[in-house]
């Protein structure tokens, strides 16, 4: 995913428009004195609107149905009824727990274990390598300036620069075979 862990953990179902495919980042999860609560995001630029692909929307719909069944079984014991990602008692999942769940999913799928932040980095790298504008990438990641994006992912931009040079070289100086 391309969200910070706290943003992902703080998602409520009213932050996701399943019919239009839009996800709104409006909160982050903070933990104080052992209690989790939603707070405003890291910066004003962190609040954002992200369009989700259809396959993610399908997975979210399935998750929502499964979660509704679990909430029904739990009765009144479900702690946060609107949270998207919860533990077995319906309380917020914290980042470390999400990473444990992600590791289990990867193991079941026969994939190497990864962390949530790796998904954020991969998302940014794929966008960069697809020549998406730095401003669009910065907006999706919640960076207030493109400088943050460029500084953080400069190595990926450098790789793209080499590919761009090779493409120009092929187009201008090499004959198609």
Name each model feature, range by range.
Residues 15-22, 113, 132-154:
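Short, polar N-cap/turn motifs at the start of nucleic acid-interacting alpha helices
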Residues 3-29, 135:
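Short, charged phosphate-coordinating catalytic segments
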Residues 20, 28, 33-56, 62, ...:
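C-terminal secondary-structure termini that scaffold catalytic or DNA-interacting sites
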Residues 50, 66-74, 80-139, 143:
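Short, basic (Lys/Arg/His-rich) helix/loop patches that form interaction surfaces
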Residues 6, 11-14, 96, 122, ...:
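Structural detector for helix-capping/boundary residues
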């Amino acid at each position: 995913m391309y969200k910070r862990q706290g943003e992902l953990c703080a998602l409520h179902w009213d932050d996701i428009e399943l019919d239009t495919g839009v996800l709104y980042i409006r909160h982050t999860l903070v933990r104080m004195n052992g209690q989790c609560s939603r707070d405003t995001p890291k910066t004003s630029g962190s609040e954002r609107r992200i369009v989700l692909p259809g396959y993610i929307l399908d997975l979210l719909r399935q998750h929502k149905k499964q979660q509704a069944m679990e909430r029904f079984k739990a009765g009144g014991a479900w702690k946060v009824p609107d949270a998207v990602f919860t533990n077995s008692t319906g309380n917020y999942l914290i980042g470390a727990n999400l990473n444990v769940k992600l590791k289990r999913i990867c193991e079941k799928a026969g994939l190497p274990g990864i962390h949530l932040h790796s998904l954020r980095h991969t998302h940014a790298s794929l966008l960069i390598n697809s020549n998406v504008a730095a401003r669009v990438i910065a907006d999706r990641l919640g960076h207030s300036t493109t400088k943050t994006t460029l500084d953080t992912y400069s190595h990926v931009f450098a790789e793209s620069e080499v590919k761009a040079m090779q493409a120009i070289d092929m187009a201008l100086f090499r004959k198609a075979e």
